[in-house]
């Protein structure tokens, strides 16, 4: 017998033809015939519900299996991802509830080796981006402000989380965690069974505390969507023919990472026919925007550190030099893009004419160098002045500066 024989009986009792039933239920007659004879392995729930509704029958709904994962995700790491992937393959719907507390989170940052503090939006974005193709995963943010940390805050926290889940309509069948000590607490305070995933950390031996303490040491455990947050940026500045581009390339090679080339040179070739004589004030915002995109790309794919050929202060300095005024859009990017290490190269290497340079005299080079220093100070940008005149000495000095910035983490 077919599991849908009761539908055949209902159709006969109502005296309807298959075509009439199919039309009313939003399906073809052929699909309905195969459905009634159990020829379709995974019938559409929507079509089945429409068919039951037309025949006046109650649609037999299967109880969903709901899972929930709690965490700070500060930061998200591959151990979290393993837990979540295991959980979401065992349930129909998985809810990830990210807890945040401004005071606690600030303390975690201050006790860490992280160069910047992740915001709540940063942490949500990591989760949303990482699991965006898995439609049975839902992401939530839960404010834990004022709740004592474990193990003292279970009563207050559990009351808060129960109210939160009730508001969101979340009725978990199971809680998934890797923390063995939390399982009895979840059962006692929430009345929900816990499924432990890799509690011994045999597959993913990592914790958020380890990454906060030394991100670069545990780089392999930081997910693709999270790595750009931890990337350190090094901007190499200097006047024309100061060796910036060559040095950036050499540094990226030696640190096995990415670099952002000077977009202004590409812009001159692609928009001005390779000659700066047509450059005007309205070009500087486009140059700055293009350079920002180069930087973002380099940071996204970097291996711990990204090297930047020329910063926005330099772009602004050229605008001021040639146009007699600063550009507000370029200034906005100066304010937005703050690099971890800014190296200003002394303009004391041989000047090389390449068709895109016009400040070749010693007087012009010195004046532009002074302008760069002045504007860096005006924008409260700390920098290291590298004065070595020979290329090898300059290279070695910059390598040491980068290693110093990376610290023991490098």
Curated annotation (Swiss-Prot):
Keywords recorded for this protein, A-Z: ATP-binding, Cell membrane, Cytoplasm, DNA-binding, Kinase, Membrane, Multifunctional enzyme, NAD, Nucleotide-binding, Pyridine nucleotide biosynthesis, Repressor, Transcription, Transcription regulation, Transferase
EC number, UniProt record: 2.7.7.1, 2.7.1.22
Major location (coarse): membrane
Pfam hit, one: AAA_28
Highest taxon of source: Bacteria
Transmembrane segments: none
Effect of residue 173 to N: No NMN adenylyltransferase activity. Binds DNA independently of NAD
Effect recorded for residue 212 to C: No NMN adenylyltransferase activity. Binds DNA independently of NAD
Pathway in which the depicted protein is active: Cofactor biosynthesis; NAD(+) biosynthesis [regulation]; Cofactor biosynthesis; NAD(+) biosynthesis; NAD(+) from nicotinamide D-ribonucleotide: step 1/1
CC annotations in GO: cytoplasm; plasma membrane
Gene Ontology BP terms: NAD biosynthetic process
Effect of residue 22 to T: Loss of DNA binding activity
Enzyme class: transferase
Binding site for NAD(+) 1: 70-73, 77, 104, 144-157, 177-179, 204-206
Catalytic activity: beta-nicotinamide D-ribonucleotide + ATP + H(+) = diphosphate + NAD(+); beta-nicotinamide D-riboside + ATP = beta-nicotinamide D-ribonucleotide + ADP + H(+)
Stretches the record annotates as Ribosylnicotinamide kinase: 230-410
CDD domains hit by this protein: HTH_XRE, NK, NMNAT_NadR
Compartments in which it is found: Cell membrane; Cytoplasm
Cross-referenced PANTHER family: NADR_TTD14 AAA DOMAIN-CONTAINING PROTEIN, TRIFUNCTIONAL NAD BIOSYNTHESIS/REGULATOR PROTEIN NADR
Biological role: This enzyme has three activities: DNA binding, nicotinamide mononucleotide (NMN) adenylyltransferase and ribosylnicotinamide (RN) kinase. The DNA-binding domain binds to the nadB operator sequence in an NAD- and ATP-dependent manner. As NAD levels increase within the cell, the affinity of NadR for the nadB operator regions of nadA, nadB, and pncB increases, repressing the transcription of these genes. The RN kinase activity catalyzes the phosphorylation of RN to form nicotinamide ribonucleotide.
Subunit structure: Homotetramer.
Protein name per UniProt: Trifunctional NAD biosynthesis/regulator protein NadR
Lineage start: Bacteria, Pseudomonadati, Pseudomonadota, Gammaproteobacteria, Enterobacterales
